[in-house]
Amino acid sequence: MPFRSNNPITRDELLSRFFPQFHPVTTFNSGLSGGSFLIEHQGQRFVVRQPHDPDAPQSAFLRQYRALSQLPASIAPKPHLYLRDWMVVDYLPGAVKTYLPDTNELAGLLYYLHQQPRFGWRITLLPLLELYWQQSDPARRTVGWLRMLKRLRKAREPRPLRLSPLHMDVHAGNLVHSASGLKLIDWEYAGDGDIALELAAVWVENTEQHRQLVNDYATRAKIYPAQLWRQVRRWFPWLLMLKAGWFEYRWRQIGDQQFIRLADDTWRQLLIKQ
C-alpha cells in the first residue's frame, strides 16, 4: 500500500495513524538492520524501516518498495506500507548468522532470484563511483583514486553475460535462515544488472569460497564455470572501487572511524587485484 505525502511524519504519528494496535518491541531479534525497528500485535510482527542514507534521493527508497512488491515472499519480505521516509514490511523469523551458508544453497537462492522478472531499472556503477569521489573528504582524495576512476570510465562497464534482477548486498548479515529456506533482507541497492556483478559483490571469506560459489551457480545456470569466473573477475575492480568509495562517502557523512579502516582495507585489496 503506497501512501503519498510530501510532509514527513514522526514514528509516533506513523504508528497511531496506520498501526494503532501495534507497539514497538524493545528486544530486537536477529534479522534487523540499522535504521529499523520492530512492531507487534498479537503475535504479528512488522519491520518499520527508514532510508539508510538520509542524503539519497527519495526515488531510491521508493524503488526498494517496488522491488519488494514484485518479489515472491519465498525470498524477500512482503511490503505493507510506503510513504515518505517510512516503509513497513513483514518480519522474517529465523536466524541471521555471522557466516555465509553452504555455497550450493546460496547459489540456489541467487539463481532463483535471477529467474524473476526484471525490476525495470538498471544498476550503473560509474555514476556512483563519481558521486562518491565528489562527496568524499577532499583530504582523502588521492591521485591514485582519480587515476583508477578515469581508467574505469575509459574502459566502461563489462557487457552483461545475463541481465537479471539483483540484490547487490549479499552478505551473512542480510541472509535470514528461516524454516522455509534462505531469504534476503535489505533490498536498498536492488536493480537489474549482470548476474556476474551479483556474484562478484557477494561478501565471501576467501577466494576458494568465491570460486566454489561461482561453480555451483554455473552448474545451475548451465554456464561454463571458467567463463562465469572470468566475467566475475572483470567486475572486481568496479566492485572494490564501489566499496572503497562508499566507505569514504559514509566517513564524511557521519564521521565514524570504522569507515576509514574499511576504506583503507579496500584500497589495499584493489591494489592487490589490479
UniProtKB/Swiss-Prot annotation:
One of this protein's GO BP terms? thiamine diphosphate biosynthetic process
Which positions are tagged coiled coil? Answer: none
Look up the domain of life of the source: Bacteria
Enzyme Commission (EC) number: 2.7.1.89
Entry annotated with the keyword Kinase: yes
Species name for this entry?
A: Shigella sonnei (strain Ss046)
Q: Does the keyword Nucleotide-binding apply?
A: yes
GO molecular function terms attached to this record: ATP binding; thiamine kinase activity
Catalytic activity from the UniProt record = thiamine + ATP = thiamine phosphate + ADP + H(+)
**Pathway, per Swiss-Prot/TrEMBL?**
Cofactor biosynthesis; thiamine diphosphate biosynthesis; thiamine phosphate from thiamine: step 1/1
- Please state which protein family the record places this protein in: Belongs to the thiamine kinase family.
Write out the function statement from the record: Catalyzes the ATP-dependent phosphorylation of thiamine to thiamine phosphate. Is involved in thiamine salvage.
Q: Which Pfam families does this UniProt record tie to the protein?
A: APH
Know the name of this protein? Thiamine kinase
Its lineage opens with: Bacteria, Pseudomonadati, Pseudomonadota, Gammaproteobacteria, Enterobacterales
Could you list this entry's UniProt keywords, alphabetically sorted. ATP-binding, Kinase, Nucleotide-binding, Transferase
